[in-house]
């Protein structure tokens, strides 16, 4: 894929229980270094949409985002998506292939992958802590330890994430509804390989990198593996990710 074939506009989608604020400063870095027009949308039930009920299917989440994405219908775009956001992106490409030029999927999965790879057993203690604790700081600390191999004890980052939670409270039922939607999602049978790039970390303690590998094999699409970052690759090694983005644009 050449630089000219890539879109100017890119939509960034987060995963389970996360919001657009968790992308920063990564999205701003992409805009500055790549010259992209970057957009973010919160999934229904989270972030700016926290007062809404989260749908029970990935297709409904995708449809909701389609209706809210303020871009002209004839303007092509790409999607950078993490984890559950990748499921939404795959479904979106399947339903609107004429608009979406490129998907970059980070540590994603689907119901076609074994359940112990979609949520690894070693992540379960932190998942449990995040769900049952009544204290936001304890919940966010558990999530950070689960998704990051480099910032699990970052006090400043924890403070920022707690502030996001205070601004946009999370309803436990919405987390469970997202989990249900993810568990039912099956990846489309066919998608154009030249519009797909899978990125994953071998050291992801939440979702096995093998899920990304299986999806890449399914579509005969390229995959690149990081050796040490955690599930939240944009947090753990943003430079590595941007270098991969530059690769598809033919930049050095």
Predicted regions, residues:
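Conserved alpha/beta-hydrolase "acid-adjacent" motif
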Residues: 205-211
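Gly/Ala-rich beta-loop-alpha elbow adjacent to hydrolase catalytic centers
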Residues: 81-85, 89
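Conserved HGGG/HGGXW glycine-rich cap/lid loop of the alpha/beta-hydrolase fold
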Residues: 3-51
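Flexible "cap/lid" loop of the alpha/beta hydrolase fold
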Residues: 94, 103-132
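Active-site loop/oxyanion-hole signature of alpha/beta-hydrolase fold enzymes
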Residues: 37-78
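Short beta-strand/loop motif that positions the catalytic acidic residue
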Residues: 192, 198-200, 204
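Catalytic histidine-centered segment of alpha/beta-hydrolase-like enzymes
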Residues: 229-242
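Conserved alpha/beta-hydrolase catalytic His-Asp/Glu region
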Residues: 136-189
């Amino acid at each position: 894929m050449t630089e000219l074939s890539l879109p100017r506009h890119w939509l960034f989608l987060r995963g389970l229980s996360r919001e657009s604020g968790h992308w920063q400063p990564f999205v701003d870095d992409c805009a500055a270094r790549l010259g992209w027009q970057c957009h973010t949308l919160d999934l229904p039930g989270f972030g700016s949409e926290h007062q809404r009920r989260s749908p029970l299917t990935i297709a409904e989440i995708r449809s909701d985002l389609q209706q809210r994405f303020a871009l002209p219908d004839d303007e092509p775009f790409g999607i950078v998506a993490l984890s559950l956001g990748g499921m939404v992106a795959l479904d979106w490409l399947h339903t609107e292939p004429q608009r979406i030029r490129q998907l970059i999927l980070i540590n994603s999965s689907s119901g076609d992958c074994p359940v112990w790879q979609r949520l690894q057993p070693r992540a379960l203690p932190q998942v449990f802590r995040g769900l049952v604790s009544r204290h936001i700081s304890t919940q966010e600390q558990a999530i950070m330890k689960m998704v990051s191999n480099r910032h699990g004890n970052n006090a400043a980052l924890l403070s920022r994430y707690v502030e996001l939670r205070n601004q946009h409270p999370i309803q436990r039922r919405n987390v469970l509804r997202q989990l249900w939607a993810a568990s039912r999602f099956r990846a489309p049978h066919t998608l154009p390989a030249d519009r797909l790039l899978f990125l994953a970390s071998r050291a992801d303690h939440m979702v096995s990198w093998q899920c990304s590998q299986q999806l890449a094999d399914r579509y005969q699409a390229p995959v690149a593996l990081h050796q040490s970052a955690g599930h939240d690759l944009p947090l753990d090694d943003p430079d590595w990710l941007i270098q991969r983005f530059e690769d598809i644009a033919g930049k050095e």
